[in-house]
Amino acid sequence: MDQARNFYNTILKSSHPLLLSFHLAGKAVPIVFYIIGSMFLNFTPQFITVVLLLSFDFYLTKNITGRKLVQLRWWYDSTDVNKDSNFTFESYKQYAPGPPINAIDSKLFWWSMYVTPVIWGVFAVLCLLRLKIFYLILVIVAMCLTAWNTYGFRCCDRWEPNSGQSDGQDTNNWFALPSVPGFENLSRLANIQSFFQRQ
């Protein structure tokens, strides 16, 4: 009971306690529904509900909570084939100094962003061990959505607007494989943006 009260008091110290609560709930609700949903629903409605919850969390994090809690926003434009990177970023770094980012907001935002894909990864391993292929598909969708959002925010956080590089130009180094002679196609496969573009 004391831990719940301490966590509640921590949330109250946030700059945006209601928004931080929605952010954390957006991460937790799909996981909880994935765990207990099979007790009262068949697979199909559970699958649809979890994917809708994940989509809502993706939208909420990408467009609202990321912007308010850590002052970061990103989007991916796959239509512009002339750019080195299709990421576009908005960051507190490119504007005049404003109110500082609350340490509690930042810490809980980043912890939730990094822990959520790991939890879905554990579920993927469990699905493989128990040979639950259909649930594995659901977990892979969840891993992709949460990891892609985390990757976008990580690149946005690392982006330096005054470095002379275009938006997101140097962000793909984090995901690139090491250069191994004879395996150029493998490293191109790891570069996510080139996967969706015509050569």
Curated annotation (Swiss-Prot):
Biological process terms from the Gene Ontology for this record are: protein secretion; vesicle-mediated transport
Q: Which Pfam families match?
A: DUF846
The source's domain of life comes to: Eukaryota
Q: Which residues form the signal peptide?
A: none
> What membrane topology was assigned to this protein in its record?
Multi-pass membrane protein
Membrane-crossing residue ranges in chain numbering: 18-36, 43-60, 108-128, 133-153
Keywords, alphabetical: Glycoprotein, Golgi apparatus, Membrane, Transmembrane, Transmembrane helix
Q: Where, per UniProt, does this protein localize? A: Golgi apparatus membrane
User: What InterPro entries would the database entry show?
Assistant: TVP23-like
Q: Which residues are glycosylated?
A: N63, N86, N185
- One GO cellular component term: cytoplasm
Q: What does this protein do?
A: Golgi membrane protein involved in vesicular trafficking.
**Family listed:** Belongs to the TVP23 family.
Look up the further comments and give them: Present with 1040 molecules/cell in log phase SD medium.
* Subunit and partners: Interacts with YIP4 and YIP5.
Q: Report the protein name in the record.
A: Golgi apparatus membrane protein TVP23
Q: Which organism is it from?
A: Saccharomyces cerevisiae (strain ATCC 204508 / S288c)
